[in-house]
Amino acid sequence: MDIEIMIPSDEPVRLLSAVTEELNYEKLTATYSQLGRNEYPPRLLFKVVLYGCCRGIYATREIERACRENVNFMYLLEGQRPPDHNTIARFRKEHLPYAVEELLDQMVKLLMQNGEISFEQSAVFIDGTKIEANANRYSFVWKTAVTNRQRKLGEKIAEELPKRLEASGTGIHAPCIITVRRLKKLRKGLYAKKKEQNITFVKGKGHHKPGLQKAIESITKWLKKLKRYNLDIHICGDRNSYSKTDVDATFMHMKEDHMKNGQLKPGYNVNVATVSEYIIGNYISADRTDTKTFIPFLNKLCNIHPVQRVVVDSGYESEENYRYVDGSEQLSLFVKPSNHEQKKKRKYKNDIGRRETMAYDAEKDEYTCAQGQKLREVTVKKRKSETGYIRETSVYECADCKDCPVKEKCIRQKKTDKTPLEDRVKRLYVSKYFIQQREAMEKKISTDEGILLRVNRSIQAEGVFAMIKEDMNFRRFLTRGKVNIMAEWYLVSMAYNVLKLHHKIQTGRLGNHLFALDAA
């Protein structure tokens, strides 16, 4: 029976097969052993797994069943017998992670050659979302808790170890600094004393343990805990937490909070870059905010593609990101300031304590509050971020806030503040460079070009996640470990590009790079 006649000419599987035939699989083939012949060509397995993503089929057993029952999957196998789920699982875990990113780059270049992706006529739209990891929700390890337990254990060892050594009668003294290495060396010395004195260790009820045995057992127990704590802190690295069942996953707040209690779940922060409605790159990190992911992601994109205009939402706004783009002649940034919508509200405009509502004299470099008092610069503070960026903040202080009738409205008083409100003076913490960049960005995004790109960011960047989560039914990773989940996400990205290309062909929108404002 000829399977091909059963598949309509406009079916996405035909387009997928045609696009994937244009790709080079040398890097994927190189992951296999050169001895003998592969049971299934890597090209066919890649097609099958990719089409499974297009149809929302991700589990290997479901893909195996589809290869036996679905005509479209049979068409991709080109007469080969259906692979079993173990073959598909090995392909995804042992081979695909080493080549899938390069395959996406090939697909992007193919779309560029056919005029579907244009960095000149479109822009790079970046957005992020959090995808839940395939890990137990209550398998958390908190770095702060481990650090506290490590400190308390160190105090306990420092207190009890000298007593244990004295009771052992060996004459060995406790080290000044407690470390795993020194405890091992100490235990080795105690075992030598045991052999020298021919002491027999006992166990069970009715036996009195000698002091040497108690000392060795205590040190062994402490060593086990110390090693565990050191390993936990090492796994956490720069993160504050990790999951025991997927050590690369970090606990984050997810958008899907059905219990409405702010529950933390293990997951990954997935950032996606789109151009002309197609995904051109991905960046997966453990950062819970998008601010820190901007620079490494943009560096990665600029090394591969001719990036020019970059459009992001307010979650990416920071002084460090402004400085990075400002130092590049190639890049032009469009970012909506985080207070863009907030400052339109009446409450914001009537807040006399805000810097934005105070008059500023640029020549004298001073602010004037609602009561006519002057706030002048008294010092400049420098603060180093986790990434090493040094931010300069000017501190402006009012000379006299005594007996001010609007002091409660002007100065925000927290419950944790030790200084009473009567003794406090108004201070403003101002980053001059950040304010300068933000004001310039407000003008930039209000131009016709800025409005067009902001509207398209909402459609193209956020539309990617809408389609992947709803239409492609991808809401949670199936695999574990950053290498595996990256391969999984890159597959989903390529499947999205195929479906997007098919949709543009069917709707006659080939060659369109931006949505017009009237169409949006």
What role is predicted for each listed range?
Residues 75:
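Aromatic-lined, polymer-binding surfaces characteristic
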Residues 1-4:
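Short domain-edge segments at the starts or junctions of modular domains/repeats
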Residues 9-50:
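Basic, short loop/linker segments at the boundary and entry of helix-turn-helix/winged-helix-like folds
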Residues 49, 56-69, 80-520:
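Anion-binding and metal-coordination hotspots
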Residues 36-37, 79-81:
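A Lys/Arg-rich helix-loop hairpin that forms a DNA/phosphate-binding surface
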